[in-house]
Amino acid sequence: MFSENLQTNDRFFWDNWFNRCSGQNKLISFTRKTYSPLQIWLFCLKLPDGHIYTGITAGSSDKIGRKYPFVLFYKPSSIPESLDSLFSLLKKKNSFHEILKEGKCCIEDFYNSDTTGNAILSESFHNFLSDSDGIGSFWQEIENGDHIKHEGLPSCSLFNKLFGS
């Protein structure tokens, strides 16, 4: 989990969701698990207290095979600032992919990395951002454009859709 200015309550929010849901998809341990190719998600979360998180995330694993979500996020103060952060992250998708592949993250290197060409957010993502009502989140897979719109606070069901197990 990386952010320019990680606050205690930010860390609590993410840790609470990840810890609550990380073991929820292991009900039948003897079934054969198939792993899908790496999916990198661009997201925006709107919380009840008016806070917004925008970021990029993917499932990752350490050298001994433990799986965990890797998240890099911003905490913008407005919708225009949210759009700026999303476009910036989308343009740095190759750098994010390299971080996942190499297993090393230096936040300054990420922010200073080269950007790719055009960054396009789906119309559905724009609609979510412009909708000022409600608590929820929007997740767009950056390669194929698949998306998930989730009402309410992040749930274990959403966690498993994004990160599997």
Where are each of the predicted segments found?
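Short, structured protein-protein interaction patches enriched in aromatics and acidic/basic residues
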Residues: N25-S60
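Long protein-protein interaction modules used by eukaryotic assembly/scaffold proteins
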Residues: M1, N5, P48-S165
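Short, isolated positions within intrinsically disordered regulatory regions of eukaryotic proteins
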Residues: D10, F18-C21, L45, S132, ...
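N-terminal ordered "arm"
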Residues: M1-Q39
